[in-house]
Amino acid sequence: MNLVVTALVKQVPKGDHSGRLDADGRLERAGAVAEMNPWCRRAVAQAVRLAGETGGRSTAITMGPAAAVDVLREALAWGVDDAVQLSDPALAGSDCLVTARALAATIRLLDDPPDLILVGNSSVDGSTGAVGAMLAELLGLPFTGPVLALEPADGRLRTTVQYDAGTESVTIDLPAVVAVAERSCDPAKAPADTWPSPDVVRQVTTADLAEGSWGLAASPTKVAQVHPAPLTRNPVIFRGHPQSQATRALAELTARGCFQQQSTPPRSGRQAAGEGSGAAPAPSEWTGLQVAAGQASRLPSTTPAPDGGAASRPLSTERRGAPRGEVVVLVGDGPVEGTRALLGAAAALAAEVGGVVTAVATEEGDREFARWGADSVVTLDGDEPRAVARALTGWLQGRGAWAVLGAALPWDREVLARLAVTSDAGLMSDLVSLSAKEGRLSGLKPSGGGTLAEIISRGTPQIATLRTGLLPLRTPRDDRPLEPQTLHVEPDTAIFRTERRTGSDGDALDRAEVVIGVGRGVPPEKYDELEPVRLLLNAELAATRKVTDQGWLPHGRQIGITGRSVAPRMYLAVGLSGNLNHLAGASRAGTVVAINTDPAAEIFAHCDVGLVADWQEVMPYLVDGLRSCVSG
């Protein structure tokens, strides 16, 4: 089979961008040095490989301003046969749904319909991870990803899909849309002096597309404002002999209460997630999705902190006025603690807007879901994302649902991205908090330059995915039975799944009290030297994107804008520079401790306690001191 392969590529700012908005409310990118998105480099490399190996043809498409032609020139230099740029001022401010529509319309202009459309799994400037699935829905195609390996066979594509907790073998019918993982291959990088002239790129405007509405005005979601991340930490930096630094740092951490009695880390399983709760305390009305106590100072006022600890705040049984709609929560096979936190967040929102919570789940769990916040439960009898989205589309018609929420995980992302297309509602993706503002949903997500972008939606229903590791666990309410309901889901014969392999316990990061983050300054053969401090602190190991890209730690251990977000009691950053895209994932840590040999490293501006030292020299002294701190 001579494969016709199309790779979608995006130009992104190189490094951190400012996060500022222009006069029209769009993220300001003028003057920033730009490059091809790292994930898109893999899509280009795979497109060239597959087309070359099968005697086919490859095309690269980008949507962006005139300067974005450079990513196509680089793709052509790498070996892509054709390139198309969609560029029009009318497209400025397009959200992911309008972007997907414009790209779908551009693909329909191609002389040869593609057998395979490759997209990067994410982007360093937005991390929606939704355009690929939206594009698949618009084109009526199956979707899978992020894939580590892909090979054509008899009109189908055999892939290995990467998840936080391992991999899965997936075979998918062609034509299809596939998201490419960053570790799938070496990136397509060509020296600028080898790029061809821009004249060889085919130029397309909205006038060439089928009739449609474009740009910010047509987008159901938008960035309302960008909140700067204030430097709320007051770093205490130590220098000198490693032993002296360790002694002084431990004294500072002890004074901060960092070594007070640690609670037992949450165990997996629904029983553990709700164990020991007993009867619910007296009802206490929620006023929106809250963050853990003591962490609100690092967030705008849209997410007020509760009076008590995050794990002790009870679920509310009160509703304000007559129900005006419902908050639907999509429950897949993600971490149990994440499901509990998400249902609690939904109950908070429902209390705010006078609604109810309906859990739509792939497996039965009526009693647990009810205790965690659900007022009703619907069980799906199938779990293929495309088919689930179709079933939900029909089920939601006429219900007047106020919002549909899911976790920021691959299954939830695909279902809700497809639902965003069929409902014309758009998607707010990878949010770290939610609130109700004037009866509408508002969410925050990490943006460039260490900022938080406030996203709003005018769609109906309002659809969002959340990073559940940052949501508080609420005390379950009284056990009560719910009437079982079932929603039929048709099978999807275009996709076949086999052999799911578990390779990572990255989900443990979501509720870890202490996290040790490692950068490239800690080579993998030295990880054993971190074991004593990890065991003493009962900590989980995490990493920067560059570490996981190199395969030193599993992808599920990555923290940052394009990885996980955590809120531990203490975050120990070892051998990492402090890139703001990484620190966005640990911004809600109670105390940040940094160890780096470079006194000018960015991490020292965003920590509470810093040690200017070689981690291998200072760590033995820290371990010796920690033994008495922890035991005491």
Over which residues does each language-model region extend?
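N-terminal glycine-rich FAD/FM-binding segment characteristic of electron-transfer flavoproteins
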Residues: 1-632
